[in-house]
């Protein structure tokens, strides 16, 4: 072998244009594998798609204002769970002491994961599936996020329909859940809760008018024997669901230009209502005692594993990571947007909202506890029962009860709408970016998505719909989300590389993430997520609703729903490997190498070229260890030859239509060859350079 030439044992690669063309710009590139066996050269080739041009990236829709994006993210992250879940967990797990594990997990895992998703979407400017061009074998992680978002839409929209039903029912002089004199009430209904008693004289359990209105007047649960006896959809709830679907469609059909305007109402209204309810709640008798119980500090509870587990799980679900929503929203940002600042702002607002909503919730719970002379623990609960039974019951006892009920359910409606918009946007953006046909017909595709969620949501508005709702809530958005986020952070930090990801962020913000963020992404967050996944499986309990226990077949169906989203990751990985040419080692090398060059999308249209990631199992070769050679021109076969050192100047390769090589990519003076794997990274293709292994 000639002097100065890198030794390539038995295999070499050529990256050359598939056919000669005079037009400038990105070309389709043919990847040719040349393998020498027994003196015979065997070739295999495949056609590589060119990277997205800067012009195409510039054409992507962007938010009209920065505030549109921030309100959309805040509106999505701050949802109904902030009202019904966090205050209860805080009270249950030692009051103010619960903030210690909550804030700890927020800092070491919640904010880093939130920041990672915002940066991932903003840099790649695609939806949940498209961003995985950074590691094609893990594109299934994006489809998992899209599928989970779709599943959540099947039952989350029903909560909004319930809130709308309550809102419409509040426009009366007397709220329908005030007394027991309605057709849906049972003999067990009691207008007042007896102190320290939950049973009537004959041993039958007592129920409140608010509880019977929700379960019998709205859900008609008494007409169903279980999940195997659903009955027909209730026309009242179906009508409310139709209105919700129509509202979602017209909020989303034109993309972020319309949704960005809607969130100015849906994201800000809850704060106005929460403030009004807080002013009213703290004046009620018993409110101070309940707030004191909410904030009481019991540091001994920190020795209990359940407290830390509850905090970890709450962090995962309260921020909305793993659903593709943050990726979709940030993909419409300007390339130079400061996503780090956005992550800090939105996560802080989310946590403060969760904490402050506890004052509102417990002021009314304290009022109810004193009114019925029962301990605060007897009325404190989480889930739909808090906002559709306990809270309406408290509002019904206030002067101007109808006014306060309207205000409260307007808040629930707006909290639900912008969160549902985020979930739908994840599905629409994620699939539209993958399939251009859907992108060209976004309005029609949006209609199909919302119609699909409507049709499947009908199962949740039947007589036994609450059982379907509980099953979906238990399985569709549980372990599968945690698994998806775990695979996401492994893909970014270990396959794509935390150093390259940091370089991407530096291009956008001008600042490389500090060592703290890199350590969180690479070590702390994966360990945290693995811990939560294991705990969620180990502490699994079969779903139930009240005294009703789901049959075994329903539990099996729930696990099948969860597995259907998680299985997309290995299925797509197997498909990707099978669809690539070459040996198993070559397939794996190409499957974990980014598909396209990441470019800076700005008004200048320039796209800085990065050294390609050289696959070696997992991880990346640094560019200083690469051996750079010019590709041969069209029609020339055989292995490439090394280039002279490009010191202090740039060099263009006209036949590729590529820009000159930046000075910072000047190869080192000594050429170090790496294992014989093919490098097919478009960053090399676009400059006419190929890295020889």
UniProtKB/Swiss-Prot annotation:
Cellular component aspect of the GO annotation: axon; neuron projection; plasma membrane
Binding site for dopamine: 79, 149, 153, 317, 419-420
Chain residues that bind chloride: 314, 318, 354
Topology in membrane: Multi-pass membrane protein
Regulation: Inhibited by GBR 12909 dihydrochloride, amphetamine and cocaine. Inhibited by zinc ions.
Region feature (Interaction with TGFB1I1): 558-587
Swiss-Prot/TrEMBL site (Contributes to high-affinity binding to cocaine) positions: 105
Protein name per the record: Sodium-dependent dopamine transporter
Organism expressing this protein natively: Bos taurus
